[in-house]
Amino acid sequence: MVYTITCNPSLDYGVTVENFQMGHTNRTVTEQMNVGGKGINVSIVLKHLGIPTKILGFTAGFTGREIEKRIKEQEIEAEWIRLPQGDSRINVKLLSNEGTEINGQGPDISKKEVQELEEKLGILTKE
């Protein structure tokens, strides 16, 4: 089992816009919503390679619930620490002549919540 840690998971909203013009209304040609975050991305690749994996990380708010749902739909094992405030981030990926990314900040994580993750990791090292 390979464990990955994602402290700041995201919903990545990718849109394709032909001839994007700053300061004007632009219409999308395609839209796509995916889960993201470095640990999540690694676990997705491991799953596709047939390697058992489990995600450990933090989620918050409605976006966090959507991240959890989408990971479950991909049949990837995960253990989330739900943060009481804020929302997991949304990243906007604008594809046009040039690619532009706008990454959300994500929720604040308290020392108590970091300790909770450290305890989970401590249990793993004893196994």
Task: List where the protein language model places each region.
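Glycine-rich phosphate/adenosyl-contacting loop at the front of the ribokinase-like
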Residues: 1-56, 65-66
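Conserved N-terminal subdomain of the carbohydrate kinase-like
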Residues: 49-127
